Amino acid sequence: MSGLRPALSTFIFLLLITGGVYPLLTTVLGQWWFPWQANGSLIREGDTVRGSALIGQNFTGNGYFHGRPSATAEMPYNPQASGGSNLAVSNPELDKLIAARVAALRAANPDASASVPVELVTASASGLDNNITPQAAAWQIPRVAKARNLSVEQLTQLIAKYSQQPLVKYIGQPVVNIVELNLALDKLDE
């Protein structure tokens, strides 16, 4: 019985620290130092939440830039179904899937001349990625320009404006947030 008291008091102490103090401290510090990120990096227009800067959305119309394929098949970009998605390179189903995606992209972008960018036919590790390279966005310019009656120059400037450089220049590559880019396209129409 004498050994039970130290074990119980240690349990209660650790329960309070790990179940109360630590979560409250990290929540308070997160809200204080990084309020936008701690609340989901939400993109707002006035009081309306239009999306998150961290999760892609399913833009399908010709007047929008399309992101990477979502791995969450039933409901695209569903964060509750996030997970690994790509088939192994040795799997013949991957070749069929990529060929079907390339054919669909070619049909939707008949004026695009270069080969289809790889990130437009392969899902990301989470299946929720909202970023593509500026080159993948530029590949879609003819379709978007035609659908929105905008010039190639306007869209090129918009892509450049919403391109984000990596924190360290030689680690990573520039990316474009598709959600922010498409919301900016909608603002051009207003």
Curated annotation (Swiss-Prot):
The family database entries (Pfam families) matched by this protein are listed as: KdpC
Task: State the UniProt keywords alphabetically.
Answer: ATP-binding, Cell inner membrane, Cell membrane, Ion transport, Membrane, Nucleotide-binding, Potassium, Potassium transport, Transmembrane, Transmembrane helix, Transport
Tell me which Gene Ontology terms the entry assigns under biological process.
Answer: monoatomic cation transmembrane transport; potassium ion transmembrane transport; potassium ion transport
GO CC list:
plasma membrane; potassium ion-transporting ATPase complex; potassium:proton antiporter complex
Highest taxon, organism lineage:
Bacteria
Q: Which residues lie on this side of the membrane: Periplasmic?
A: 35-190
Question: Which residues are in coiled coils?
Answer: none
What InterPro entries does this protein's entry cite?
KdpC (IPR003820)
Report the subcellular localization.
Answer: Cell inner membrane
The protein here is known as Potassium-transporting ATPase KdpC subunit
| Lineage, uppermost ranks | Bacteria, Pseudomonadati, Pseudomonadota, Gammaproteobacteria, Enterobacterales
